[in-house]
Amino acid sequence: MSKDIATPGRTTEILKKYGFLFKKSLGQNFLIDSNILTRITDTAEITKETNVIEIGPGIGALTEQLAKTANEVVAFEIDQRLLPILDDTLSAYNNIQVVHGDVLKADVEEVIAEQFAKPDLPLKIVANLPYYVTTPIILKLLHDNIPADSMTFMLQKEVADRISAVPSTKSYGSLTIAIQFYMEAELAFIVPKTVFMPQPNVDSAVIHLKRRKEPLAEVNDEEFFFEVTRASFAQRRKTLWNNLASKFPALKPRKDELVEGLNAIGIDLIRRGETLDIPEFAKLSNFLGDFLKEK
């Protein structure tokens, strides 16, 4: 079997063989350090009793490592130019299926049912995500309720900081809440920019998301809950009142009544959104939802 893909020499050899040119628009940066790949699969807790979905396999470096440790791997690749390369680099493995397509447009549950020989095995999602589509992909996987026990992503460190943030920090925001509402988030380790080809401008990080048995807080309307959280961070330096009144103008004539009601449940509208934890946002959105329905 050929040596691991994730080395500078082997990666360069593959790229030259196929005359492959990186597409900046697809955020293509290939990992050239196999030690990082081992740490990713260890973080994801992949075993031979695990099915894995990978997004953006590139030339197959992470895919190869996943295939060594998982039962079966299904990889989504959007760039048609990479399909013959993957056929070549992964030819030694019989437990990999490469699906040509955009995961953002795919029916992932249908792919799971059709592509995995044993679709009922525990599922994990692992990916080196392109920076430009990181947030849309993660939110799609959450909102489509893909039955994955965990998701392990390598992504831009700044985004990993936002996903794993705690209240009253500059990284904490609506993205934090959108993900931590459903998942426990752990920033596992930092990945220096020097282990990629081509080298990106910033460092990356690996984040591990583990599905909660129940959402972190009870809300009456999830869609409205996320609408309230996004509004609360619309302008970070503004108070809850200023942001919410801008989003929901019907609140303005009833400010005194609203202040009194929220004070009764421990929420002061002079606070900023970044100071509220997820259970407090749940109380806020539940109260606001009922309040706005009143005549």
Curated annotation (Swiss-Prot):
What Gene3D superfamilies does this protein's entry cite? Ribosomal RNA adenine dimethylase-like, domain 2, Vaccinia Virus protein VP39
Task: Please give the InterPro entries that the UniProt record associates with this protein.
Answer: KsgA/Erm, rRNA_Ade_diMease-like_C, rRNA_Ade_Mease_Trfase_CS, rRNA_Ade_methylase_Trfase_N, rRNA_adenine_dimethylase, SAM-dependent_MTases_sf
* Keyword rRNA processing among UniProt keywords: yes
Sites where the protein binds S-adenosyl-L-methionine = 29, 31, 56, 77, 102, 128
Q: Which domain of life is it from?
A: Bacteria
Q: Tell me where in or outside the cell this protein is found.
A: Cytoplasm
Spell out the family assignment given in the record's similarity comment.
Answer: Belongs to the class I-like SAM-binding methyltransferase superfamily. rRNA adenine N(6)-methyltransferase family. RsmA subfamily.
Q: What is this protein called?
A: Ribosomal RNA small subunit methyltransferase A
Q: What is the scientific name of the source organism?
A: Listeria monocytogenes serotype 4b (strain CLIP80459)
What gene is this protein translated from?
Answer: rsmA
